[in-house]
């Protein structure tokens, strides 16, 4: 079983590094891992809060990770925050422009996010990308 991890609102890289070292999880913040023909890449943190990234840095982090996925058939993008304009934001939480730009640029098959606890389980499509707020419970799906 492979486990990917990335920081949310309150975790710093020290905490993520500790969990990677202790449990062998894969840090997805700016990195990828591949399983067969599936490539997973991500960006943690949020565009608000203690450890915030600006929109340009969000996109650059996702691009850096995505650029190494040249030999996979399917891509999964994992972020803490939801994309700008998503129904996941309930019209109150604007989401990330950088994440929306990444969806439109890289066209991952699936985008997994969290951040808004109240919309756990909501799914939508942005272009051809299936966007899922997995929340705390998570979601199991197969390709």
Language model feature labels by segment:
Residues 11-98:
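Conserved catalytic scaffold of divalent metal-dependent phosphoesterases
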Residues 6, 43, 132-134:
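Hydrophobic residues at beta-strand termini and immediately following loops
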Residues 32-37, 53-57, 100-110, 117-143:
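Binuclear metal-dependent phosphoesterase catalytic core
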Residues 1-4, 26, 39, 74-76, ...:
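Proline-centered loop/turn at the N-terminus of a beta-strand
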Residues 1-7, 91-94:
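A broad, low-specificity signal for short, low-complexity segments enriched in glycine/proline
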Residues 82-84, 116-119:
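Short Gly/Pro-enriched loop/turn and capping motifs at secondary-structure junctions
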Residues 8-9, 80, 114-115:
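Active-site glycine-centered loops adjacent to acidic/histidine catalytic or metal-binding residues
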């Amino acid at each position: 079983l492979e486990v990917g991890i990335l920081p949310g609102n309150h975790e710093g890289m020290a905490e993520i590094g500790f969990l990677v070292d202790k449990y062998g999880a894969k840090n997805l913040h700016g990195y990828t891992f591949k399983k067969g023909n599936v490539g997973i890449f991500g960006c943690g943190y949020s565009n608000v809060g203690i450890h915030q990234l600006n929109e340009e840095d969000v996109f650059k982090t996702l691009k850096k990770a995505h650029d190494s996925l040249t030999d996979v058939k399917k891509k999964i993008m994992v972020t803490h925050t939801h994309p700008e304009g998503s129904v996941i934001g309930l019209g109150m939480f604007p989401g990330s422009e950088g994440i929306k730009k990444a969806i439109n640029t890289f066209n991952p098959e699936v985008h997994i996010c969290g951040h808004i606890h109240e919309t756990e389980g909501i799914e939508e499509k942005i272009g051809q990308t299936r966007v899922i707020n997995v929340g705390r419970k998570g979601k199991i799906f197969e390709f």
